[in-house]
Curated annotation (Swiss-Prot):
Primary localization: nucleus
Name of this chain's protein: PAX-interacting protein 1
PANTHER family: PAX TRANSCRIPTION ACTIVATION DOMAIN INTERACTING PROTEIN, PAX-INTERACTING PROTEIN 1
BRCT domain location: 8-93, 94-182, 664-756, 763-851
Compartment list: Nucleus
Organismal lineage: Eukaryota, Metazoa, Chordata, Craniata, Vertebrata
Gene (name only): paxip1
Subunit: Interacts with smad2 via its last three BRCT domain-containing regions in an activin signal-dependent manner.
Pfam families reported for this sequence: BRCT, PTCB-BRCT
Protein source organism: Danio rerio (Zebrafish)
GO process annotations (BP): DNA repair
């Protein structure tokens, strides 16, 4: 039936006032109006919000502030098809649902199709039988079928098993689809069908998809389980194909051909050749070119290039300072390093088959760097690193080395002659003209290159084995040496001319000149050493200051931590004192209340005696019969008073049944004897009371009106004689809400919520009558429990929040209601505030701003305060004992029931007993087995 053919029943939506959020189909609006629905212009006036976009701000406001149901347009269409208003819980458009955005295809699931379909649609997803582009998930039990093969070709379609849906619903969170791939499912197949599977494998191996994994390869990760190639839709497979797909077994065939084929079971696992080649390219690029990167840094090369050039070009005479000479040596060292680096690079590119020579050059060069730096101060006036020249000369051919040695011998001979001339000039001043002539003659000889040098240059040019870079390097070093010698000779010539011009005036200063130069150099060296020491001292001082600052900061942090710890300890002490004071006040209040109740009971008893004088004889007989029972109770009282005076009991010390017994779920109330009291409305309704008894008996328990034989007392309030007597006798006092909880869990557990225990004021009292309460952050059963607690305390509950509300109960400090409450200055408290009021702590009404009521994100916000209920929980310290005979008889009864059901299943369920027509409250209890909801319904109907 299409949407155009839908016929809306008359007055189907007569009680619906809808508000549309966003853009929806106008046919949906027409269906609502055809069913007498009314559209409103403001969301606060509506009863239903119709929306497609769950993230719209108006949707959150309607749900959070006004507590209105938000449904999708499909709710309207399906309600029309069903002819009745459907529940709104399964039609929420909000994005926080488990299967929001999931469109699942469910083929080959005839048995579980309805259940899985309901799970997905109820939690926000869509289902369909056709496999098309809208599908996001394919749900199949086994890795086979035409739809499965088609889904493998699309990365955007996720393939899962039905267990993925069930586990996601249990956890209330969408599970990872990769963990539920059907290929990960292990199953057995008959061995004799292996030949058919081999034929099918050989026929499919030429297709567009690969075979399945072998048992050895099935254990690998399922991350690459799909092919990335696009493909169109496939026609449905025939019956023969489905039969052949069922007949396969890859667990026994272990041939090498099969294993080789199954290693690459999908194209996604085969590594393409392109990336593999690219990963090998960096290894090819690593050769001998990067060897120069390992050369150690040059000492002294941190200065700017201009300063190094100036230092290299300056003269190296006797009066040059040590710093200039050091710069000159460093510049020459740098030029040698650059030349050697160029030699290494060219050698690597020209001779790739001889990397050992290059490595030897670099190793010798790096090893000699330290010696060059240490020898700089002792180089004399030449400033040339001799060790560097020797290392470079070792790389030359033998003939070139001999010529260089001859040249160095000539230069050293010239230097010795110059020194002898200086000494002669100092000792014999009259021989100055002859010395000048000899010096001038040597200078001319130096300016004119000797034939040996010319011949050496020609020989160097004729060597075929000598690299051009080393030849250039030697020429540069020789020119620099000659240039420095030339400058020295010019300076010496000028000095000799001055001495010759003024021999008498300069003679006293002529003798100590050279020692003064050495002294100046020594002084400069001392100054440099002092400067370095001063710098080191400054660095040490800075480090000490930083360490002191760090120590001070650490001390300050430690002091702050100690102060915070002290403050926390003080706060804890204050809180403990406040709790002790509250406990004392509560105990005093309970004593006063019990005394007041006893006085009231005595007065009522006296009035009854005065009004019923004719019944005195019967009352006396009744009292005589009760004397033995009272005597027994008095003997038990000392033991009970000891248990009541014990300290508060924690939940870890409470028991249900004995831990060693294995009790079946069908009879989990075995050994429990219930007495029902203080439920006047339910006691008056005989039909409701019979339902309670029948449900208890069906789960293994019994109901008895005598209090002395019972183990559990179902009561609503603590203000009654029956409750006081049961408390003295050590009975377990619980409410019908606790019974409803254990019926759901199928296990008798101690009370762990406030509603599981009777409240501490009479049923007619209303301690919170002045409050209008709203709730935020609580959902499902927690929200229903808070509604019932507010009703029991006499407060008015509203699903929305407005300025007239007096209290907002929050689960966490967030949300739209919380922000509005802060803006309107409405007190925001946790659920413990309402729990304390129900359990007798009426001081919470005045202490609504107390710090313990503003602590949110509690692990169990509806749990009772153990300081207020320790007397109620003392009976749960002793587990309920079950005799082996009772447990054996229970198991025998359960087996007989199962046998009867299996032998002759009844076509129609027989009636257990003749009962009148059930009312609405009984109908709810029969289907939901929820005592708390029935209680709430009865009270609301009475009010």
């Amino acid at each position: 039936m299409s949407e155009d053919d839908l016929k809306v029943p008359e007055e189907l939506f007569k009680d619906v006032k809808f508000y549309v959020v966003g853009d929806i189909d106008q046919k949906v609006v027409q269906l609502l109006k055809s069913g007498k629905g009314k559209e409103v212009s403001y969301n606060a006036l509506a009863t239903h919000i119709i929306a497609e976009d769950g993230d719209n701000p108006e949707v959150g406001e309607s749900r959070e502030v006004f507590d209105l149901p938000v449904v999708k347009p499909s709710w309207v269409i399906l309600s029309v098809k069903c002819g009745d208003l459907l529940p709104v819980t399964g039609f929420s458009p909000e994005s926080g649902q488990v299967f929001f955005g999931v469109t699942a295809c469910l083929p080959h699931l005839a048995e579980d199709l309805n259940a899985l379909w309901a799970f997905i649609t109820f939690y926000g997803g869509d289902c369909q039988l056709h496999f098309n582009k809208k599908c996001t998930h394919l749900v199949v039990p086994e890795p086979k079928g035409a739809k499965y093969e088609c889904a493998l070709r699309h990365n955007n379609i996720k393939i899962v098993t039905p267990e993925w849906i069930l586990d996601s619903v249990k956890e209330k969170n969408r599970k990872d689809e990769m963990l539920y791939h059907p290929r990960l499912t292990l199953y057995d197949a008959p061995e004799e069908e292996g030949s058919e599977y081999e034929n099918e494998r050989s026929s499919r191996s030429e297709g567009s998809y690969s075979d399945r994994r072998s048992p050895h390869s099935r254990r690998s990760s399922p991350t690459s389980s799909r092919d990335a190639s696009p493909a169109g839709r496939r026609s449905p497979s025939t019956k023969h194909e489905r039969k052949s797909e069922l007949m396969f077994d890859d667990s026994d065939d272990s041939s090498p051909e099969k294993e080789d084929r199954n290693l690459n079971w999908t194209p996604a696992e085969v590594l393409p050749p392109g990336p593999a080649k690219r990963r090998l390219q960096p290894g090819k690029e690593t050769g001998l070119i990067n060897l120069c990167a390992n050369v150690p840094p040059v000492p002294g090369s941190f200065g700017p290039p201009d300063a190094r050039m100036v230092g290299a070009g300056a003269g190296a005479g006797g009066g040059v300072p040590m710093g200039v000479e050091r710069l000159e040596v460093m510049s020459e060292w740098n030029s040698a390093a650059r030349t050697l680096r160029n030699i290494t690079n060219n050698t690597d590119t020209q001779q790739p088959s001889r990397p050992s020579n290059v490595a030897h050059i670099i190793q010798s060069f790096s090893a000699s760097s330290k010696g060059v730096v240490d020898h700089m101060g002792n180089q004399g006036q030449s400033g040339i690193p001799n060790q560097l020249l020797l290392k470079a000369q070792q790389q030359l051919p033998p003939e070139a080395q001999q010529q260089l040695l001859q040249q160095q011998q000539q230069q050293s001979h010239q230097l010795q002659q110059q020194q002898q001339q200086h000494q002669m000039a100092q000792q014999h001043p009259m021989m100055l003209p002859q010395v000048m002539q000899m010096h001038h003659h040597q200078q001319q000889q130096q300016h004119q290159p000797p034939p040996q040098q010319q011949q050496q240059q020609q020989n160097q040019q004729g060597f075929p084995q000598m690299p051009p870079q080393s030849h250039q390097f030697l020429q540069q070093q020789m020119h620099q040496q000659m240039y420095s010698q030339h400058q020295q000779q010019q300076q010496q010539q000028q000095q000799q001319q001055q001495q010759h011009a003024f021999p008498q005036q300069m003679r006293p200063q002529q003798l100590p000149r050279l020692p003064l130069q050495h002294q100046q150099q020594h002084v400069l060296q001392q100054q440099l050493q002092l400067q370095q020491q001063h710098r080191l001292q400054l660095q040490l001082q800075q480090q000490q200051q930083q360490q002191q600052q760090q120590q001070q900061q650490q001390q300050q942090q430690q002091q702050q931590q100690q102060q915070q710890q002290q403050q926390q300890q003080q706060q804890q002490k204050q809180q403990q004192q406040q709790q002790q004071n509250q406990q004392q006040m509560h105990q005093q209040y309970l004593q006063q209340q019990q005394h007041f109740l006893q006085q009231q009971l005595q007065q009522q008893h006296m009035q009854q005696l005065q009004q019923q004088q004719q019944m005195q004889q019967q009352q006396q007989q009744h009292l005589q019969n009760q004397q033995p029972l009272q005597h027994q109770n008095q003997q038990v009282n000392p033991h009970q008073t000891q248990t009541m005076l014990q300290p508060p009991i924690t939940s870890a010390q409470l028991f249900g049944h004995e831990p060693g017994h294995d009790i079946p779920e069908e009879g989990f109330l075995v050994g429990c004897i219930f007495a029902i009291a203080d439920y006047p409305e339910q006691m008056a309704d005989k039909q409701l009371l019979a339902t309670w008894k029948r449900i208890i008996q069906l789960n293994g328990g019994t109901v008895d009106s005598a209090l002395n034989r019972c183990t559990h007392l179902l009561c609503e309030s603590q203000v009654s004689n029956t409750y006081l007597q049961a408390l003295r006798e050590g009975k377990r006092c619980v409410t019908a809400h606790w019974l409803n909880t254990v019926l759901k869990k199928k296990k008798m557990v101690p009370p762990h919520r406030t509603l599981h225990l009777p409240f501490s004021f009479p049923p007619g009292a209303k301690p919170c009558a002045q409050h209008i309460i709203s709730v935020t952050g609580f959902v499902d059963s927690d929200r229903d429990d808070l509604k019932l607690m507010a009703y029991l305390a006499g407060a008015r509950y509203t699903g929305y929040l407005c300025r007239s509300n007096t209290v907002l109960i929050c689960k966490e400090p967030s949300g739209l209601k919380y922000e509005k409450a802060k803006e309107w200055r409405i007190p925001c408290v946790n659920a413990q505030w309402l729990c304390d009021i129900l359990l007798g702590n009426f001081e919470a009404l005045r202490q609504i701003q107390h710090s313990k009521y503003t602590q949110f994100n509690l692990p169990d916000p509806l749990a009772p305060n153990h300081h207020l209920v320790h007397n109620l929980l003392s009976a749960w310290r002793i587990p309920v004992k079950i005799s082996p005979e009772a447990l054996a008889s229970l198991r025998l009864q359960l087996k007989q029931k199962q046998a009867d059901v299996s032998v002759q299943p009844p076509s129609k369920r027989p009636k257990l007993e003749e009962l009148p027509t059930p009312t609405k409250s009984f109908h709810l209890i029969q289907h939901l087995t929820s005592f708390s909801q029935a209680l709430n319904l009865c009270r609301l109907s009475s009010t």
